[in-house]
Amino acid sequence: MSVEMVSDSTFQKSVIDASQEKLVVVEFSTKEKLNKRGEPNASAKMDSVIDGLDAQYAGEIEFFRVEVNLVWDYSDPQKPMAKDDLNPAASSAYEINHGPTLVFLLEGERVQENLLGFYDEASTRQKLDELLKDLNSRLLKIKLFRFIEEQINLAAQRVITKKSAQLDDIAYGKLGVFLGLRRTLQNDTTAQDIGMLDAMNDSLQCLGVLGKGETILERIK
């Protein structure tokens, strides 16, 4: 699988949407891949590294590539600026003035300073592993929210499509539990939610899933 190439017109749908669920790395790579000596330049080398990492981090990190053509503007000799004429909106948004540059996004926001220049595979992998470790709690919470939303939709659908006049207690129970968890994680807890969570904590502690005195919210967060 090759790294998806995106442009100004597809950046929002491809990159920003993907970053709502997992860490996204965007490589801004120069269109020109050779240096003046006719050898692979830094962008060409970084392309190869990112292509390899794309397979290694499948499911954990989503990689994208944006081609840039940087033209230097010397209208102000004291503050020359590099401007991209291929995908100026994305390049401007992330202050790209060098290729290659890596941008790291989660939930549509940068989670680390841009990484400029070429890094070999081992160095890049080390930086990615450190970032994943730093973002671990946040990534787990995103996965949990997605799971909760899926369970809410499944339970609600089962309640709605129930053909029997008898209430589906299991579906209603699941719906109540997951709605309560969602409200709690969104800091909109009700008294009923607190009672439900206390009961869940007691049960999970008895089963050994949680340690003595530990709560499900502590485990989640």
Q: Could you describe each region identified by the protein language model?
A:
Residues 97-136:
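Non-catalytic, surface beta->alpha helical segment in thiol-disulfide oxidoreductase systems
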Residues 169-187:
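N-terminal interaction modules that seed assembly of large macromolecular complexes
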Residues 152, 156-159, 182-189, 204-211:
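A structural signal for well-ordered alpha-helices, especially hydrophobic packing surfaces
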Residues 4-7, 28-30, 41, 46-85:
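Thiol-based oxidoreductase modules, predominantly thioredoxin-like and allied folds used
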